[in-house]
Structure formats: structure tokens, C-alpha cells
Amino acid sequence: MRFLIQSLCFCLLPLLAVAAPPYQMPAGAADHDAPDIVAGYRAIFTCSAHFFARRPLSDILKVELVDVQGKGFPDPVIDEKRQLVFASDPNNTYKRIAAYRPDMGCTLLPPHWQLSDVPRLPNVAYAPAPDVSALAFPAGDKVGLPADGVDPSYPQLASVLTKAFDGVTHAKVPGTVTTAVLVIKRDKQNHYKLIAERYRPGFGKHSGYRTWSTAKGISAALLAIASQQGMLELDKPVSIPEWPEGDPRRQITYQQLMRMSSGLYSGGANSAAVYFGGQDVVSAATGTPLEVKPGTRWKYANNDTLLLMRSLRHLLADDLRYLRFPYDELLHPLGMYHTQMEVDHLGNFIASSQVYTTARDLARFGIFLDQDGVHQGKRLLPEGWIQFVSTPAPARSVVAGEWGYGAQFWLLDTMPEVPNGTYTTFGNKGQYVTVVPGHDLVIVRTGVDPNGIEYKQDRLVVDVLKALKQIP
């Protein structure tokens, strides 16, 4: 059952008619330690974690804000009634505001916007989500696992879960912090069953958290749906209205953006001005020059994903349809009712990172991928799309012992003992949705790993497979 649209407040002028913000950072990159960026980080994270995930500030300070604590910044202030968060730097020079709308998530206001500008934010309201508590997973939330979270048919998974949470076994450097691990297996009747599920204290089946770059996998699926509906072709140039006729960037194809080989200048994974500064997506993503011929260089770039979503908005040519598209065409059909895709102040999805969801919703997404983009007998993704995203990008060399890259997904089958064809999303701080196609498995791991500490998802995959006796 999909949400039904009830009302729309989208009081902005058309995108190109809106005055540009007073600053535009190349590629949306910025100094992560700049006081205005840190204040923005604290505002947007507190807003999403509190109003969407329903977590108290005391916990948010220890989890979401742990990497920016100890710098003399005052605690963010939460306005429950108006659903706002205020944050500032130690000198109170930079005052940042994040605003929550129940069906849109949180948006960080740009520095030049005031409290009186909050009503200008895009806001689509939906009917309440259906009650699926009595439906069996993945359609609903009925699971029936015992207290330890392990299906009695697979007792050997108990030790795997213990290792996943110990902060050492699957860590490149000790200190990982796992918040959830889910293992889903398809049986002989083609039913997907949750056979293991465990959470860190303070988190649970409805605990939302930022996906970081796992959002790129969701964005890829949205572009795939647009392709299935005849809006675009992978090998055709991407449709970006900000690039005029004769602009060499108009040669860049959808496929090259998907494979992180656009050839554009980029801040790489640094999009701090967009994520935490309040810069709009379009000025950040469309304003960078071409450095090399498209398709000849692989460079991980948030902007490539943001350009894909900018193109989707242009192709749809309808702001309301654009805001509804992820929910109407993907999330709600899959039963992902606990997922929100956040937007900037001009209504652009920040879909390279800023999606909030639960581990169970990520599992639903992984099941959909394992079904080759078919849901309840209906093909949502083009045939062959999953093969495309899980095939190595031509511009990136395959190196044994290093993860490969496909198209908005990472490839794990370059790692020891990992089966061929295994692919995964990968978000900062350890957000993974991993599909092992030949073994009927989906493995979700979420975390709040400290900066500089990486969780080894490939080792979790191998441990699960060994526990299930699917590999020696």
C-alpha cells in the first residue's frame, strides 16, 4: 500500500529563478573543521536523529556528534514545538538552523536564511503509514526470532553476531561500533526469511540512522526505474539544463556518472558545503569543469550521484512528482515506510548521502536487489540492471585485495574467500547492504564507527557463509 498525497506546500519559485546563495563552494567541498560547517553538522544530525529517529539529545551527543565533541561548541538546542534545532559555534558567530517536516525529514537552512524563511521549505504531507506489524517480514514486521536474535535452525550464527559487535574481529583498526546486523536467507520456496537480527543497546528495529553513501545504491535504483519507464538510456548524454549547448560536459553519459567516471573536477567524498553548510545541490554539482575525457578516469565523487538526481528532476519536469517519485515508485512499494530522503532548501534530494532509514528497510532493499529488481512479480528495474551495477567499472583497475567498483555499488568478490558476484553498498561509519547472489543471502550491517576506523564487511560475509556451511 502506498502513501496517499494529502497536501503540498512548495512555495519556491522555479529552481533557476531562485537567487543563488551568497557563496558557492566548488563541488560543494569545504573544510570539515570550519566553525560554520561544524555548527551545521551538529544542527542537521541532531534534527534527524531526534525528530526522525526519536533519540534523546544525551544519546545524540555520544553517537552522532561524538566526532565533533570537545571543540567548545555549545550543545544544540531542540525546539520540540516548532520541530527545529539551533546550533552555533563557540563564539556564537555562526547560527545554524535545521527544520524538520514529518514527511520530508530535516533540512539545513543556508546561512543567509532566517527563521522566518522556514515556511519556504518544500513540504509534502502523506497519509499515515499502514500498520504492518501483523504481516510477516519482509512485507511487515512479524519475525518471531528468539531473544538472542538467531533462528534456532542456524545456531552457528550466534557466534558470528557476537564477533560483529565486539569491535575487533571485523575491524581494520579496533574500535568499530556496530548498531545492527541482519542476515536474510531465501528458502527453497523462494521466501526470504530473517534468520539473524541483533541491535546495539539503544537501537532497534525502528531505529533510523543516516545511510551516508549507501544512499547511492537507492539513487541508482531510482535512475533504473526512470530507465525502465523510458525516461533515459544509459549510453545517452545526461540531461542537465545548467549546461548550455556546446558545453563539453554535455558529452557525459548516465553510464559514466553511474560508474564515477564523469571526468569532472570533484571534491571526491567531500561535500561538506552541501551536507553541513547549506549549499544547494545544483550549484555544487553543476558548476565544476571537465578535467579529463569522460570515461577515462575513475574517481569516487559525490557530485556524480548528485548530477544523476539533478537530471531526474529535470526529466520529470514536475516538482511534486519529483518529491513523490522515490516513495511512489520504490520505497513504499517495497514496504520501506521507515525511510526518508532529505532535501536541500530548494527541494533537491541530497541523495548521495542524506537518507535516513532502518536496518530492516535496508534489508527490504537488499531483497529487492537479490530479486533482480522484481517485486511481487512486477519488474521495476530494467532486465540486466543488477548485472550492470555489479560489473567492474572499465575506468577502474581491478586489484586483488582491494574492493572493486561497479556502478554506485562496491564489489567485494576481489577479496579473499568472497564468492563471485558479491556486491554491496558502502556508507561512511559502516553502513552496508550486501548481496551474495549465488548463495541466496542478503547481509545488512549498520554502525557508528568513529572517524578513521573501518568495518571489514567482506569478513562478515565470509563468516556468515562459513557458519551456514556454504563455503569451506
Please place each PLM-identified region on the residue numbering.
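A short, well-structured edge-of-sheet supersecondary motif
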Residues: 86, 159-203, 434, 440-444
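Non-catalytic propeptide/linker segments at domain boundaries
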Residues: 88-173
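Active-site SXXK
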Residues: 181, 188, 192, 209-235, ...
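Short, charged, amphipathic alpha-helices and their helix-cap/turn boundaries
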Residues: 189-198, 271-294, 320-339
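Active-site helix/loop module of the DD-peptidase/beta-lactamase fold
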Residues: 229-263, 287-289, 317-353
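Conserved catalytic neighborhood of penicillin-recognizing serine enzymes
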Residues: 244-273, 277-296, 301-306, 357-360
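Active-site Gly/Thr loop motif
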Residues: 336-340, 387-443
